Structure formats: C-alpha cells, structure tokens
Amino acid sequence: MWFLFLLLPLWAGCAEPGDSEWVHLPSKCEVCKYVALELKSSFDETSRTRELIDTRYGFLEDDKKKKKIKYTTSDIRLIEVTEGLCSRLLEYNLHKERTGSNRFAKGMSETFQTLHHLVHKGVKVVMDIPYELWNETSAEVADMKKQCDVMMENYEEVIEDWYRNHQDEDLSEFLCARHVLKGQDQSCLSEQGDSRKGDTGPSTGTKKQKKQGEKKNKSKKQNSGSKEEKKQMDQPMAAKEEL
C-alpha cells in the first residue's frame, strides 16, 4: 500500500474567510462576469422554443381582445431565468492551478482529478481534510453565490431593461461594464477563458450507446449470415426429397 501525505491548502473551506493565504474571495468583477455568463447561457437555453403564452383570461371584455404572446419575449421567461440564476454558480469549482478569473470553472480541478485517480489506484492519500469533504463547495464559490444574490436584487431593473430593449447588445458589456462595474476595476472581463477542461462528471453514455449499437449491428449481420447458410443447406435437401 502506497501512502501520500499532503498538507496543501486545496480546499478553502478549512480556513476562515479572513485568512488571505488560504481564501481569496471573488472580486466584484469576477462575480459579475459569471453572473452575465450564466444569464447568457440560460437565455440561450430558453430561446429555442416557439411556445405561445395565452394572455386572455376571459374575466373582462378587454381580456378577450388580448392576443397570445411569444414565450421568448414574455415576463414568464425573464422570471424563470433570473429566479434560480445564482444557484447555477454552485456548479462551479475552484481551480487553484489557474490564474485570474479562470480559477472559477465547472468541473473538477486538475489537482483533485489527480488525487482522485491516486485514490482509485489504491494509493492512500492523507490530507488535512477528510476524503468525504473533497467535493464540498469552497468558500470562494459560496461567497460568489452570496454576492450574486445581492447583485441580482440591486440590478434587477438593469437586467429587465436589457431583456426588453437591448438584447442585441452584449450582456457582459451592458450589465457589468456600464452599470455594476462603472468606474471600477473591469480587467477580468477581458480575460480569455482557459482552454483546459475539468472532469465534468459522469459519462453521458454516448460511447456506451455507440458500442451497444455496434454489437446490435454485428449480431444482425451474424444472424443474417447464419440464415443465408441455412437456406443454402436446405436447398440440396429439398432437391434430394424431390428425387
């Protein structure tokens, strides 16, 4: 049995928020950057439907005259997107091997991928935190979610204005540069995303389905081949019976 002892500050949850050596809380720029990114993503996910919303309730004569409106321009879509927006930030992890705002990304960090692989190979990894807490939300990500809640409340009208009148403009520029970070540090907005990707979780099953499909095709070919051979063998037997 191999032993690996690590006393590295890999998990921010072990330290107090005031300990700068362990915890580097997200800046206002970083929070706004990922809030805008998740807003874009969520609006994009809900933009593909052609659903119509019926606004006629039939209680008043004026209500009967109202027409159906598109879901993509409705208040319902805006509410659904913004309501659970900050919870999406909890899908992020802290990647301490990266710099700048790229330290926040979805998927497992390279450091923890390596540690998990060592554990799966039978190496006993001893750290200052138990194995069960390796995948817990870090203090930085928890704080980003907290700041997001406040930001969404304070800039609700700005987001609504973009949704109704400025969807042709970049959301990061409109929300962060012009409003949230006006006159403040905006350097993180221009940082390019890290091309490295973490372990995003379990397989989607595509490869497995592909293999199963290949097996089915192979089985079909074998069955068709055996049927053909049987047919060829039956023909001489039938000829003998006729004789």
UniProtKB/Swiss-Prot annotation:
Disulfide bonds join C29-C188, C32-C176, C86-C148. It is found in: Endoplasmic reticulum. Pfam families: DUF3456. Residues 226-243 have a biased composition (Basic and acidic residues). GO terms for cellular component: endoplasmic reticulum. Residues 186-243 are annotated as: Disordered. InterPro entries: DUF3456 (IPR021852). GO terms for biological process: innate immune response. This is Protein canopy homolog 3.
